[in-house]
């Protein structure tokens, strides 16, 4: 309510939850709040548009329709990194996550101040996380919701979510 944001659930229902829509929200969530920079500090005041971790980018790539493997004319698996959609999605995601304050990779293996705790503390508008992370959000003061990773653009026919023990969704 504080930011007068578009409802992500409605964006999903309308097929308008895209990388551009997510980025618009991310920009609204970034604020120094008196800090000198967006360098992470557990006791800092800066807020971020989106805090994620390593597989969060994979979730965004898959959501944007990028495929790591596709089938050839004989229905055999082939590497798809040279596919135009993969390049387009990777390029757009790279530009989104390279903006200071709008995205921060807060990987547990590199930093003990894990992305889940930053989200729980209200230091980020959104995160890309595993469903299991929601168990740590139960007593949060802020409301949150769960939506699929965004589509590349509105012309993409459906939302894609991958499933593995480490699969991430947008929260």
Walk through the language-model features, giving the residues of each.
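Loop/turn elements at helix/coil->beta-strand transitions in domains of secreted/extracellular proteins
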Residues: 32-35, 43-48, 99-102, 121-125, ...
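Short, solvent-exposed loop/beta-turn-alpha elements that line the ligand-binding surface or hinge
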Residues: 10-14, 40-43, 67-88, 153-160
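Surface-exposed patches in mature extracellular/periplasmic domains of secreted proteins
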Residues: 7-15, 34-48, 105-109
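Glycine-centered hinge/linker elements that transmit conformational signals in sensory
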Residues: 19-28, 58-108
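Short helices/loops that flank or line small-molecule/ion binding pockets
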Residues: 23-28, 111-127
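Beta->alpha turn/N-cap motifs
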Residues: 53-56, 129-134
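Extracytoplasmic/periplasmic substrate-recognition and gating elements
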Residues: 101, 137-171
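Periplasmic solute-binding protein
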Residues: 1-9, 51-74, 164-171
């Amino acid at each position: 309510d504080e930011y007068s944001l578009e409802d992500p659930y409605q964006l999903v229902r309308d097929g308008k939850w895209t990388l551009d829509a997510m980025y618009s929200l991310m920009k609204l969530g970034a604020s120094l709040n008196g800090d000198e920079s967006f360098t992470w500090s557990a006791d800092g005041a800066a807020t971020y548009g989106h805090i994620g971790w390593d597989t969060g980018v994979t979730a965004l790539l898959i959501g944007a329709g990028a495929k790591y493997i596709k089938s050839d004319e004989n229905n055999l698996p082939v590497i798809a990194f040279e596919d135009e959609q993969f390049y387009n999605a990777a390029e757009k995601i790279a530009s989104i996550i390279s903006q200071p304050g709008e995205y921060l990779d807060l990987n547990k293996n590199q930093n003990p101040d894990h992305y889940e705790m930053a989200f729980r503390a209200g230091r980020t508008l959104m995160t890309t996380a595993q469903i299991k992370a929601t168990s740590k959000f139960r007593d949060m003061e802020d409301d949150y919701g769960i939506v699929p990773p965004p589509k590349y653009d509105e012309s993409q026919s459906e939302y894609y979510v991958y499933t593995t023990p480490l699969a991430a969704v947008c929260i």
